[in-house]
Amino acid sequence: MKLSYLDQTGHLTPDKLEQTITKYAPLLEKMKGQQGLDPMGTGWMKIDRWAGEEELSRLEEIAREIRETSDAFVVIGVGGSNNAARSMVKALQKPGTPEIVWAGNTLSAPATSRMLASLSGKDFSVDCIAKNFETLEPGAAFRLLRRALRERYGDGYSKRVIATGTIGSPLETLCREQGYTFLPFPTDIGGRYTALSSVGLLPAAVAGLDIRRVVEGAKKAREAVYSLPPRENPALQYAAMRNLLYGEGYRVEMLASFEPALQWFSKWWVQLFAESEGKEGKGLFPAAAGYSEELHAVGQFVQEGSPILFETFLSVEETDTPLPLTPDGVEDGFGYLDGKDFGALNDAAFQATRTAHSARLPVLTLEIPRLEEESFGEMFTFFQYACVLSSGMLGVNPFDQPGVEAYKGWMFKALGKNAT
């Protein structure tokens, strides 16, 4: 990934950035050696451990069976259990593959009823993804979907159930008792870091993606992190820019893109940084915007509102989708577009927005060559390493999320469960 920036505010200057990179360069070496990091959160750094040949072959075989027997594949999960998979599937799903249905990510009865109704008349399989099988949304949805499967397929329904959980968890016990297929949820990886494991890769494989190419992209990004020196290391540079701007008083980072296919990746990114850094009264608030549409919504605030945010653009260099605008004989006032490609319009809007916004706030740009499987593997891995570095600069643990337990205690009490 290429990283660049524009800034006319004076908050992000070459000298300030150089000082910040120099200050935190030792963090890069510590991270590569996993020094000071919770070993129960670093499993994703060993890509082959959870995405090696044996694991990939098994996932490909299971995905093949699902494609042959199912019109729809229901992924039950919330947060880290579905965000990575959904970002890949929404952007790159291949024609002729099963519909991927997302469940267990809401407690809305109307939304859940619509999800169940959408499966009517379809052959379907499910994958319940839950690290400890205590989260309410997937647990409740799994109960409803088990009933739907049993009503449709009788006692043989268990052949259509996959459960992804930790070894020794209640979910594994349930699989053993009911005859479901069990896939391991990595014990040494938190949910938001599980893209390169069965959690993220099985739904992607069912959707027709080449998951080996996803892994190749991840390895490419990892190699860059481990081989490039601090001043050429994009992950350290990006983390340093974020830390520098946080120190300059900025409190919001907005990830923006002119490619709608990246909107679900943005949700993954938001969770990654919100849960990893938002603790001990610290951290940038991660927000996301989909341009050009939202230039007609939040663009006004970005240009002239409270100076609390900076922007990070995620840019796709090549779209490989020619769409020429040819005259149609109607005088519509848009003759200046004659002969231009639709992609050129999008690029012009991006360049203009970046220039205009940089007069008001710092603007970072991360470029990927094209939107494909390798790109997702590279983006997941790049941002995960950058997040660990950025969290280290803040002095917080990037692998826990103690704050989410507060609302759960009240919720479980209201529902009659003994919360600890």
Where do the model's predicted regions map?
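Active-site phosphate/pyrophosphate-binding segments
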Residues: 152-311, 400-420
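C-terminal helical/tail subdomains of lipid-metabolizing enzymes
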Residues: 370-420
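Glycine-rich phosphate-binding loops that contact phosphosugars or nucleotide phosphates
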Residues: 64-228, 409
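Extended, charge-enriched "interface" segments that sit outside catalytic cores
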Residues: 1-64, 328-336
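Flexible loop/turn segments at secondary-structure boundaries
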Residues: 81-84, 109-111, 134-137, 169-172, ...
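Short helix-loop-beta junction
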Residues: 88-99, 148-151, 272-283, 356-360
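Helicase-primase coupling helices
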Residues: 287-371
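A short, well-structured juxtamembrane/interface segment
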Residues: 50-67, 232-244
